[in-house]
Amino acid sequence: MPRAKGGFKTRRYHKKILSMAKGYYSGRRRCYKVAAKAVEKALEHSYRDRRLKKRDLRSLWITRINAAVRMFGLTYNQFIDGLKKANISLNRKALADIAYNDINVFGELVEKVKPFVKAA
């Protein structure tokens, strides 16, 4: 009885891994074992970084809002607190976009918030 080695299924899986390793350098795209490790590591990085991307973008939005608000004499904390008290519900992404693209509109928003901010 001949030895069963997987045949079609193994070949299909190997081809799948090697196609995922396209664009890699040298043995990382040619040798199955090396390519499998490289692809596994790449998938780990992409999984991790999809989550980090969300944190990084939120941090960027907060930085942009803070920089824009300071031009109008407030801090980020005061501004966010004032927004809540003024019942203005804009998320940080939208606020950062307004601050980045249209500083005049953002200035009007800050002026609406200022009466609700406690004098420090």
From Swiss-Prot:
GO terms for cellular component: cytosolic large ribosomal subunit. The keyword rRNA-binding applies. Pfam families: Ribosomal_L20. The keyword Transferase does not apply. PROSITE patterns: RIBOSOMAL_L20 (PS00937). One of its GO terms (biological process) is translation. InterPro entries: Ribosomal_bL20 (IPR005813), RIBOSOMAL_L20_CS (IPR049946), Ribosomal_protein_bL20_C (IPR035566). GO terms for molecular function: rRNA binding; structural constituent of ribosome. PANTHER family: 39S RIBOSOMAL PROTEIN L20. Belongs to the bacterial ribosomal protein bL20 family. This is Large ribosomal subunit protein bL20. The lineage of its organism: Bacteria, Pseudomonadati, Nitrospirota, Thermodesulfovibrionia, Thermodesulfovibrionales.
